[in-house]
Regions:
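Low-complexity, intrinsically disordered segments enriched in Ser/Thr together with acidic residues
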Residues: 1-16, 184-217, 224
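Beta-strand elements of well-folded, non-transmembrane domains
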Residues: 28-32, 124-126, 211
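Short beta-strand elements
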Residues: 30-88, 232-242
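Serine/threonine-rich, low-complexity linker/repeat segments that form flexible spacers/stalks
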Residues: 81-118
Length: 296
């Protein structure tokens, strides 16, 4: 299955996902981009290599059909499609000039009186250090339920796949812990397992829960997998002190799951092939410092 898209059948079954929207995403990569950017810093943009397109899905469970329903949105990652539904999506760059970027997305809905649904999406565009932990602040006395996590499945290992021992990356769900002031999801550290299920480049993970308090401005804390200090990013969370809104909104809009990231070299004008919720296996080209070469 090397160099192919791998998804859970249950994620693309139309009957099991009523109302779902599907997007195919492509990354257009050039081995020479980093070198060119080093000599042309004022002209370089290493963050416009992604494009996406919406598709409808039919068929299953053995064969699926993907039909485009809109034109390609060029030079933007697919998480930006979520912003069109009312979500907030922000770009984060922990080490400008030395590493890539990731995106923090979030949306809060009020599906019934006294219940608020919190959805968070973390997308690693080209951040070599990867993401290992995500923590959301909670107010005193907040009751949390329906805690959820979603990550795309990883490919099994194969010879010279670039992972430690050719074992492939782990697909183990992240651990979740809660105390009086926060809820935290995390995978193993790099020191514990170099093949841990970190959020690597071109991959999006989802986190969610319900709470009995309305949203307030807060900070989430993200810890990185390979290197770097923790980073705080603005979100909304049930931190307390707000006035509950009695009018419920529609049921919670599902966060986009990880989108396909083929690694073919092309110009950004190419139309990405429909690919649901994949997990890219090869390492990214340098973003923007030299990193080990992509594995086959």
């Amino acid at each position: 299955v090397s160099h192919r898209i791998l998804v859970e059948t249950s994620d693309v079954m139309p009957s099991g996902n009523p109302g779902a929207s599907y997007f195919g995403e492509a990354a257009y990569l050039s081995a020479h981009e980093y070198t060119w950017c080093q000599s042309h810093p004022a002209e370089c943009n290493m963050f416009n290599n992604y494009s996406y397109r919406q598709f409808s899905v039919s068929g299953g469970p053995t064969f699926f059909n993907f039909s485009p329903v809109s034109s390609t949105v060029r030079m933007q990652p697919a998480i930006q499609a979520w912003a069109a539904t009312g979500a907030t999506v922000n770009q984060a760059e922990p080490d400008p000039g030395n590493d890539g970027i990731w995106f923090m997305g979030y949306k809060v809905t009020n599906p019934s009186a006294g219940v608020w649904h919190y959805e968070y999406a973390l997308f690693n565009m080209n951040l070599d250090r990867s993401i290992q932990s995500f923590s959301v602040s909670l107010g005193a006395g907040v009751n949390v339920s329906n805690v959820g996590f979603h990550a795309p499945p990883q490919h099994p290992g194969w010879a010279q796949d670039g992972t430690q021992g050719d074992a492939g990356y782990s697909s183990a769900p992240w651990n979740v812990t809660q105390d009086a002031s926060s809820i935290t999801w995390n995978t193993e550290t790099f020191a514990q397992n170099q093949n841990a299920n970190a959020i690597r480049w071109g991959t999006l993970y989802n986190f969610r829960f319900d709470a009995d308090q309305p949203p307030q401005g807060a900070n989430a804390t993200v810890e990185f997998f390979k290197t770097g200090s923790p980073m705080m990013v603005p979100i909304q969370a049930p931190t307390g002190g707000g006035t509950p809104t009695p009018t419920p909104t529609a049921t919670a809009t599902a966060t986009p799951t990880a989108t396909a990231t083929p690694t073919a070299t092309a110009t950004p004008t190419a139309t990405p092939t429909p690919r649901p919720t994949p997990t890219p296996r090869s390492s990214p080209p340098p973003r923007p410092r030299p990193t080990p070469p992509p594995r086959p």
